[in-house]
Amino acid sequence: MMRIGLIVTTYNRPDALAAVLEGCLTQTDTNFEVIVADDGSAQETAALIDGYATRAPFSMRHVWQEDHGFRAAAIRNRALAATAADYIIFIDGDCVPPPGFVASHRRLAEPGWFLSGNRLMLTQAFSEQVLRDQLPIHLWSMGDWLQARRLGQIKRLLPLLRLPNLCWLRKRLPQRWQGAKTCNLSAWREDLLRVNGLDENYTGWGLEDSDLVIRLLRAGIFNKSARFAAPVFHLWHRENDRSQLAENRQRLQEALQATHIRASKGVDQY
């Protein structure tokens, strides 16, 4: 059976990370490890992870780097280098997985393809309530979510729908890079290493995941949709500093016109 590594990025938001780790504890498939990819959080986060590690029926590790601003690409690369798992699932530290999340990624994984999943966005007020009252949204039924929709706590129910595993439908847009994000993305580790992981030239918020997907496609690894099979519940957060977004957009445009597969500053540093 293939070994799965679930990489969870976080930065100084232990309450949201706790909700994510609670979701990890209830997975129906427990044959995976969690690597918390920490972009420079304070000691409170380390203590939280230590507490969960003692409860988890799977291995849990904390990979940390110093806080020098938003460096998601770098910490994901460090986490990727720290695991020997065959297959990697990326989520963010504010994206809560339901019980069948890992099992769905395992079921849909296929050589030559990466998986791009979807997310259900929670409103600010509801996210604050979830964290304050420690609501177990990862265990909610469709009836619970219907009530949340009626109350305006979520804007859409569509991401919660389940579709049968029709390969022709999931492989309908194999070259699509738009919309694939590391808040819910999975790939074979050997494919990620082949493209040298994420490009750490992307600093500040935005588009490092798009660059990764573009290079995977260029390497002959295609996009298979995990929508309507493996959603995550995305807690609201304040908008990140986007001061470097224009520079990252320019870098992505250059990447779209280029032919390279490997990141010039990637996982091979570690």
Task: Kindly give the residue locations of the regions a language model identified.
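Cell-envelope/extracellular polymer assembly enzymes that use nucleotide-activated donors
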Residues: 3-5, 33, 211
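Short, acidic, metal-binding catalytic loop of nucleotide-sugar glycosyltransferases
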Residues: 22-31
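Conserved donor NDP-sugar-binding/catalytic core segment of glycosyltransferases
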Residues: 100-149
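Glycine-rich, basic loop-to-helix element that forms the pyrophosphate-binding segment
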Residues: 66-83, 100
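A conserved acidic beta->alpha catalytic loop
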Residues: 23, 38-49, 95
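Short beta-strand/loop segment that forms part of the nucleotide-sugar
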Residues: 31-41, 61-65
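Short aromatic/hydrophobic "clamp" motif used to bind/position activated sugar donors
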Residues: 88
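Acidic helix N-cap motif at the loop->helix transition within catalytic regions
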Residues: 18, 43-51, 100
